[in-house]
């Protein structure tokens, strides 16, 4: 979805609005809180067409938005991931979709309200999302699924360890 915000976070030095390293987040959150499934699909298709035009044949999509505008899970937990897979297949690019696990707003901090569409309510909730995305991916050619965390700030250390154990089959 961030492809759609190109230019929205860039300010001329004489702009009245404060502009610093983190000010792009305001634009990103504003877009994330409005974008709908059909927008996600259209944005992804535009980006993937451009990537193909420049010679890329595979994209790894770090996918953050998992919840609807009311912060509920979609009926199809993989709804937005499926929109991305559909876009990739429609333009003919190979896809590895990586649903991102995000649970906190910083080291030991609660999430900000602007982050609500990115959040998994628990590690188990994230695993359910990832399983739904894996099931969805079987319907599309050249679609793989990975695991990912936002960062050490965005996921508690114990859940990072659980993720690693889960990926290696040691959970």
Identify the residue ranges that each predicted region occupies.
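Histidine-centered catalytic micro-motifs
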Residues: 1-6, 171
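Metal-coordinating catalytic core of metallo-dependent amide/deamination hydrolases
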Residues: 67-171
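Alpha-helical scaffold segments that flank or form the walls of functional sites
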Residues: 7-94, 124-140
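Generic, ordered loop/turn and secondary-structure boundary motif
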Residues: 2, 22-25, 102
């Amino acid at each position: 979805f961030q492809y759609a915000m190109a230019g929205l976070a860039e300010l001329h030095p004489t702009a009245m609005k404060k502009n610093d390293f983190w000010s792009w987040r305001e634009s990103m959150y504003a877009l994330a809180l409005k974008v709908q499934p059909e927008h996600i699909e259209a944005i992804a298709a535009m980006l993937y067409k451009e990537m193909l035009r420049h010679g890329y044949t595979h994209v790894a999509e770090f996918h953050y938005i998992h919840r609807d505008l009311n912060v509920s899970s979609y009926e199809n937990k993989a709804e937005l991931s499926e929109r991305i897979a559909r876009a990739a297949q429609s333009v003919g690019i190979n896809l590895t979709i990586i649903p991102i696990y995000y649970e906190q707003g910083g080291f030991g901090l609660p999430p900000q309200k602007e982050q609500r569409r990115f959040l998994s309510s628990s590690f188990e909730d994230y695993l359910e999302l990832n399983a739904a995305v894996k099931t969805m991916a079987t319907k599309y050619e050249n679609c793989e699924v990975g695991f990912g965390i936002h960062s050490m700030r965005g996921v508690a250390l114990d859940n990072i360890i659980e993720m690693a154990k889960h990926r290696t089959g040691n959970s």
